[in-house]
Each structure stands twice: as C-alpha cells, then as structure tokens.
C-alpha cells in the first residue's frame, strides 16, 4: 500500500508504562514503522495522546482525574516533552516533525478548518510529519469525555483522528490501542473472540464496545463512534494492537490485522463531511416527508418542506 495518505492515532495506553510514565521504547518502535512507511512512499499524519501522562511524570505528581485544571497544567508541562521525544526519534531517520495543537473550535469554524487543511497539506508536501494532539490547555472537550449537547467530543483523540482524515482526504485511519481490535465482549472475559470485519455499526457492535481503557479517556466505545464517522465518510478504519510487532507495516502491506471497519456508500465530498461532522450543531430544522425524500436524493430543501425550526443559526 504505497502512495497512500494514512492517519495513525496512538492512544495514551500505548504510550505509557504501568507506572504511568512514557514508554520510550514503544514510541521509538512506532516512529521506526512510520519512518519506513514514509520512505516507501506513503504520507503519514500522527495523532498522538500522552501529554498529560508526560506532564504527570515530569512534575512528579500523582494523577488526579477529577481536577480539570490539574490535567491542563500537566498537559502544558508534558506536551513539549512528548514532542521532544518524537522529534529526536524521527530525526534519527532524517525526518522532520511539526506540532499541530487543535481544539473543537478550530474544526467547527469553517475558516479555521480550511486553514488547518491547508497547513497540513503543505507540511505533507514538504515531507514533514504532522504530529497532532488536542490542545488540552485551552480545551476541555477531550479531558471531560462526555457528549456535549449535540457536538462531538474528540474523546482521547479517536474522533479527532477521523476528523483529520476527513479534512485531508486520507485513504485510511489506523487506531492503535492495547487490544487486538474489537471483541464480541470484553477480551478479559471467557469466550471473547476478535471481530475481524465490521460492515455496519449494529446494537450488538455497540454493546461489544462498552468499557474504558485504563489510561485513556475514550475506550472502545469512542473508537466505535470514530469508526462510524469514518465508514459514513467513505474511509476504512482499522483498530489494532500497538504492541504487535510491525503492526503498522503489516497493515500497509495488506495483511489482515485487528478489526477492519469497511466504509459504505460513496465517499462524501469535503464540504459535506465538514457539515456532517466538523461543524457544531446550532439548531434543528423539522421537514415533512416530501422534503426528507428530496434531501436523501441530494436535492435542495425548499421552504415549503419546512415544518419547524429550533435554535439560533445563520445562513451558510
């Protein structure tokens, strides 16, 4: 699979040791694989967690999951440390990196969204590896993992990785975690089996995804939410175990690894993907059955088909 644009997301659990400190060997192995993939002609965008964990280790403090400002302070201390290791490891392969910190507002505002797209595209043209993380210092959407009204949270960067894939027209999203993929039930329970391919997000799939990861905030549930967005956007997504040797290279070589979420339908145009998943919801329009059918056919919505409006929003 050469010449492809791939978004690789690695979660906190894959980057830290059992004591919560950064696992530099795991980071180095991931960088080695990305470097090889790039030299084979692929373009890689890395979406990484781990800033808070790095900050906790640097400041020599105990984790306090209920103190939001504490987590933000740790992220501020840890982000530069996280990047310094990535820069060092990629430099060994002759590759340069660029830090990109984003918030939900950056992707929900159309102008900021387009600027982000342009910068990422230019970095890739320059042969630079964009390394993306949510800006935990100014945004709490990620560190408070709940659905906020009708907006989608980044949820430990799972959702963010797919939004970035949409923004850059990526060919594939790979989410690396601490399990082999999606199981029929918790992999710690007897009788659990790996689900190799998912073609539709069913209630059974959602039930199989219940539970959270030890260090991360998202867990499998938000990975399924991310996968559903990718599938609807026409982008395949794979969940795989970061601890598997050469996991990323095997995926790019076409080997079946982890759980593949197949896209369905045609690939959405960029503007429709942004409207569907990037723009924050400001209100609702209730339409009649005729208008619904017209919209599903791709036709325009006429005023006669509107039955009700709620919320405050502007044209466009």
PLM features per residue range, with description:
Residues 1-96, 100-315:
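C-terminal catalytic "cap/lid" subdomain
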């Amino acid at each position: 699979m050469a010449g492809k644009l791939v978004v690789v997301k690695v979660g906190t659990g894959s980057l830290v040791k059992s004591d919560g400190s950064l696992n530099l060997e795991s980071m180095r192995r991931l960088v080695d694989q990305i470097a090889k993939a790039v030299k084979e002609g692929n373009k890689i965008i890395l979406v990484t967690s781990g800033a808070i964990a790095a900050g906790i280790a640097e400041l020599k403090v105990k984790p306090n999951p209920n103190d939001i400002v504490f987590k933000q302070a740790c992220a501020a201390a840890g982000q530069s440390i996280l990047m310094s290791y990535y820069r060092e490891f990629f430099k060994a392969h002759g590759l340069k990196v660029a830090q990109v910190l984003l918030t939900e507002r950056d992707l929900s505002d159309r102008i900021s969204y387009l600027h982000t797209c342009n910068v990422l595209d230019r970095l890739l043209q320059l042969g630079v590896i964009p390394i993306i993380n949510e800006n935990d210092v100014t945004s709490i959407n990620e560190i408070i993992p709940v659905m906020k009204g009708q907006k989608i949270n980044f949820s430990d960067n799972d959702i963010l990785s797919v939004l970035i894939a949409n923004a850059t027209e990526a060919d594939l999203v790979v989410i690396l975690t601490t399990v082999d993929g999606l199981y029929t039930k918790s992999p710690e329970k007897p009788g659990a089996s790996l689900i190799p391919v998912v073609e539709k997000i069913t209630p059974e799939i959602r039930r199989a995804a219940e539970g959270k990861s030890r260090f991360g905030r998202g867990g499998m549930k938000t990975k399924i939410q991310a996968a559903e967005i990718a599938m609807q956007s026409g982008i395949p997504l794979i969940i795989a175990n970061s601890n598997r040797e050469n996991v990323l290279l095997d995926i790019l070589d076409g080997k079946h690894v982890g759980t593949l979420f197949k896209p369905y339908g045609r690939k959405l145009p960029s503007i429709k993907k942004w409207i569907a998943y990037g723009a924050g919801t400001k209100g609702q329009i209730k339409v009649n059955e005729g208008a619904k059918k017209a919209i599903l056919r791709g036709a325009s919505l006429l005023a006669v088909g509107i039955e009700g409006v709620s919320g405050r929003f502007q044209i466009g």
